[in-house]
Amino acid sequence: MRFARNPNLVAAEMDGDMVMMSIEHGTYFGLTGIAPQIWEALEQPKSAGELVQELLPQFDVAADVLRSDIDAFLNDMHQNGLLHRP
């Protein structure tokens, strides 16, 4: 299953973190830690497995730990309307 960014968001990087605003709802969201890298990797729709393959070389972590973090991010972002399934 692939995920894509909600096109109705405005995002900007600030000191390595990501700040986003929902144009539809006027709400703000902040991404820290690994989340900004996941968000950047989602410039094109991707599955969790594709994200793991792309991001694993950037982090000193086991693939299953990264997959768990990515799954949590995708689920949270989807539930908050920041990602959708194309």
Where are these regions (language model features)?
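Long, charge-rich, low-complexity alpha-helical segments
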Residues: 14, 27-86
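Long, low-complexity, charged/polar intrinsically disordered regions in eukaryotic proteins
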Residues: 1-18
